[in-house]
């Protein structure tokens, strides 16, 4: 069994770092940020921008849940509800989850592999500003007519006959801009990882978070050209007289579904795999054990990426596909659960008999595992196409989608935030407030989405803006709405925590958690050039090796410090 440490004693330990200790630096002029090519500043701007979009998407979700809290509610019209639904889904997927990992990757990829910057710094800056510009244009549609065809924009609903406003064109413009931004970033990530690793950092010594970013980049390079072609064809249908998706003139709406979901299902793992990488970094640090099955986890990441390109048609089970095709995609959907299960069992094995230090980051990773397992189980139900025929377009699908994506992405984003915030800012977040945020979010999330399985089983369809009383949906919808507000309070606690810690947080030092990877070899926050001298990497845990070397040289055994410092941060 694991040993749990909840209130450890702070003990001073020798600090190991590449530079002299420096106090957190004040932010420079805004012009320096606008023109910067420093990967760390670009990473921070990604995180701030995506955090803003996350909050906006959350407000949109609360408005929709409020509308559905009681039958025959008149808070929103059907038109406004469809617009909010489209804005919420598009924001969370294209403006939050995918680019937030670009933010973490931009900041930590060079630090973790011993590089001084990304391979293409100017391209890096261009990627960020394309994302920002696309988001601004998309949200500018609030002032005339937002898109209302859903974040997937299925034709013929998204064709000019049914969506004549410029809002739908703004959606297409956003997909192009964010797609180009992500594609350029993915190329940058790939080249940096392949060519700029520290001496001795072979592929079997690469941090697991970097493995996940490598696969994230490869999937983006594979999937994004497909959706770019699809939205270009849709734009041509709307403005240039083509009929790719127009069923009245030999077009096929199902073609859009194939193109969109060939991108869309790899996109699910694009959003989740970096979160898996965060979990693989956080658990061994706070378990005080090496990761169990390093090679198996790295291999499982690659296998998931391969299988992710073979399961897209399970989103089309309700369309007219031959039984043999349905059977193939059902089996491939089952199969993709195997490498995911390998990861989960390896994480649990790492926790088992570890000396657990129950920080907020570790709580968020444990919460992720619990939530993601539930999402995976419901996914098995939906992978059986006769079952999917019954549950298709019901709230059961909504519940599954959020358990997988919010559990797999949002909870791991928060885990990464609490884990790496001291390195970014030089200050610790308040652990008491952080744990309160976790428990409120965890309870609110399950209250919001678990009951939606029951809504789906009782027949409530997706994408309806109101419903009649007496259908058995009212109580579940009210519970779900209350849960969504509780979830929002949990997020707000973390926002307050971040704001307070920027000025009042305890100084973190270079290695507050006693980490395993090279980013902890630098001061907090790191200097412009990251490293004066990059150490030779001799294992998958280079910082542990460096600490052992210092212990041998100084004769001082580090029996504490690191993560124990969090006890004073509250």
Q: Could you tell me what each predicted segment is?
A:
Residues 2-570:
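Membrane-embedded and interfacial regions of multi-pass energy-transducing membrane proteins
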């Amino acid at each position: 069994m694991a040993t749990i440490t909840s209130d450890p004693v702070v003990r001073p330990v020798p600090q190991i770092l590449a530079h002299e200790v420096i106090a957190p630096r004040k932010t420079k002029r805004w012009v320096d940020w606008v023109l910067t090519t420093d990967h760390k500043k670009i990473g921070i701007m990604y995180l701030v921008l995506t955090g803003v979009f996350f909050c906006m998407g959350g407000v949109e979700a609360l408005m929709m849940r409020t509308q559905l809290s009681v039958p025959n509610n008149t808070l929103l019209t059907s038109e406004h509800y469809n617009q909010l639904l489209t804005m919420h889904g598009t924001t969370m997927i294209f403006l939050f989850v995918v680019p937030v990992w670009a933010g973490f990757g931009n900041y930590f990829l060079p630090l973790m592999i011993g590089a001084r910057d990304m391979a293409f710094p100017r391209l890096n800056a261009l990627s960020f500003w394309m994302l920002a510009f696309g988001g601004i244009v998309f949200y500018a549609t609030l002032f005339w007519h937002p898109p209302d065809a859903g974040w997937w924009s299925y034709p013929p609903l998204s064709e000019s006959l049914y969506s004549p406003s410029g809002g739908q064109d703004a959606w297409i413009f956003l997909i192009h801009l964010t797609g180009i931004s992500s594609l350029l970033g993915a190329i940058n990530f790939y080249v940096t990882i392949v060519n700029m690793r520290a001496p001795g950092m072979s592929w079997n010594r690469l941090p697991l978070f970097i493995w996940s970013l490598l696969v994230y980049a490869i999937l983006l390079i594979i999937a994004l050209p497909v959706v770019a072609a699809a939205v270009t064809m849709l734009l041509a249908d709307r403005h240039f007289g083509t009929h790719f998706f127009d069923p009245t003139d030999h077009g096929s709406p199902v073609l859009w579904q194939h193109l969109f979901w060939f991108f869309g299902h790899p996109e699910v793992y694009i959003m989740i795999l970096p979160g898996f990488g965060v979990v693989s970094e956080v658990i061994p640090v706070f378990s005080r054990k090496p990761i169990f099955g390093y090679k198996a986890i790295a291999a499982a990441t690659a296998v998931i990426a391969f299988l992710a390109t073979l399961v897209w048609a399970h989103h089309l089970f309700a369309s007219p596909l031959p039984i043999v095709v349905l059977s193939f995609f059902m089996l491939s959907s089952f199969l993709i659960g195997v490498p995911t299960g390998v990861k989960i069992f390896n994480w649990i094995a790492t926790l088992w008999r570890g000396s657990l230090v129950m920080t907020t980051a570790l709580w968020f990773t444990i919460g992720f595992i619990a939530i993601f397992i539930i999402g995976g189980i419901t996914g098995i139900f939906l992978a059986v196409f006769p079952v999917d025929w019954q549950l298709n377009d019901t709230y059961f699908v909504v519940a599954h989608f959020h358990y997988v994506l919010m559990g797999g992405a949002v909870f791991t984003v928060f885990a990464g935030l609490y884990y790496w915030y001291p390195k970014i800012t030089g200050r610790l977040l308040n652990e008491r407030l952080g744990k309160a945020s976790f428990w409120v979010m965890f309870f609110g999330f399950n209250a919001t989405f678990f009951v939606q399985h029951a809504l789906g089983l009782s027949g409530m369809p997706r994408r309806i803006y109101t419903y009649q009383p007496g259908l058995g949906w009212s109580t579940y919808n009210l519970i779900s709405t209350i849960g969504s507000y509780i979830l929002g309070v949990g997020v707000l606690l973390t926002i307050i925590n971040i704001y307070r810690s920027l000025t009042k947080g305890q100084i973190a030092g270079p290695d507050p958690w006693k980490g395993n990877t090279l980013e902890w070899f630098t001061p907090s926050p790191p200097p412009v050039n990251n490293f004066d001298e990059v150490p030779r990497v001799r294992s998958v845990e280079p910082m542990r090796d460096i600490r052992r070397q210092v212990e041998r040289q100084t004769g001082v055994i580090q029996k504490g410090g690191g993560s124990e410092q969090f006890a004073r941060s509250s």
